[in-house]
């Protein structure tokens, strides 16, 4: 058989095999189009489980007459126009395949009217070449899509459809998921002429809880713990059921959304399951309704044909962020259910060519805003529902990379393995008693030694040893405690009874060193460390520190600071001249005693006179 271009109808039917799985798939695609069009009310009429009729009517912005034919064509969309748009998707749809695919396996009619038009227009495609016919019609502002006789021309696909009740249950579940994603939209679902579901648009917190209860049931609402967790461009909101009271009926409630898009993501589910594992039985599953907001540049939604899955650029970071957010709420075990607070999202700039994608909360026309200041890492030490100082996760102006570079680099350094510094050697000869400087750095020798010249003498200085002494000085508290730096992702570790007792005994001293933690029955959560430790592999260093403390009978801040300084990893495997000069300046400022009385292993004089005499004799 020769190579040939497939006719449009056959090509669309092949694409429909990926997008249109069953009537519920059609409903999902069409309702998402309505939401992208800025609709605040969507009516869904179903007959015979969707096999006979699917009608979606909305009050969105509508489609212009000139664009109706394009709306039914493949790869035609108003939602993206360039590769930059594809890398930062803000609408629910973007491929431009749904209408063409659906029309190829059904009798589809599209009727629409914009506010600028005096009359509505109707379009439908038919024939082998999918030619589009457009004619005038009567219709208010908005769009109506009618899908008749789904799979009428693909008998094999129609055989795989289940009973009318089963197919409608799938449609009902899709509408439930959409209703949880968009509290601001009224959704009416009818089956065979009877109104089955009616979700009215809500705005206030109490009304949101009523919709949550109507969809998920009163038992879930009674056990729901509200989550409000943020760091930088990552925000986690929603509800998770108290695992101590989770029943089998609640385990079916597992809804997660990424930037408003309903999702079935294994990474998110694993993070939630891991946070609840200490409180859940072996055969139990967590129940949750969670909303993750993230910079669109940091997530790829162009992965699954039906857009059920996403791929995070910083998957481990997202996993641990969700894990800590859920864990913090479960640890507090608040008795009252806290509603999500209405927080006005920061205005988001939408490129002009994408305004047609809709006026929903993913595409709010915005005024120019000032550059956003870096967000302070947020970690919860009080109530989970508080949002003091919270910034909106919105406002991604054509997507500048958010946390990817600075925080991502910090996170990647956590995967490095520290090396132990060498033991001190005998004390080196002291410099001139009146000296305030090690001298001038001439060059770097062997990658980790600085060749110094001072008062006509030449010496080698060990940069790792100098760095260790500097770090010890930075960690040793003076008149005030060392400043604690909140961790990007708090570190949770399992500890023994002896280790927990040692930590509690040394907690005040560790606090002076800038190490803050909370402990429960079998775990300790490190929430802050001093600045010199931010770049360290804390997953190795902290357990070793806990083991060291468990072996001690008495504690002193100087000894703890000395142990930490000896066991941290150098930030400079290969030193440069600039780094050496900067290090020595800090050592001379913070450790002036090292200049007057250098400890062993720091300085080694170089005997130039012997070398010069040897050259003269030759």
From Swiss-Prot:
It comes from the Bacteria. It holds the Pfam family HATPase_c_3. Residues 366-405 are annotated as: Disordered. Residues 382-392 have a biased composition (Gly residues). Transmembrane segments: none annotated. Gene3D superfamilies: 3.30.230.10, Histidine kinase-like ATPase, C-terminal domain, MutL, C-terminal domain, dimerisation subdomain, MutL, C-terminal domain, regulatory subdomain. Disulfide bonds: none annotated. The keyword DNA damage applies. GO terms for cellular component: mismatch repair complex. The keyword DNA damage applies. SUPFAM superfamilies: ATPase domain of HSP90 chaperone/DNA topoisomerase II/histidine kinase (SSF55874), DNA mismatch repair protein MutL (SSF118116), Ribosomal protein S5 domain 2-like (SSF54211). Belongs to the DNA mismatch repair MutL/HexB family. This is DNA mismatch repair protein MutL. The gene is mutL.
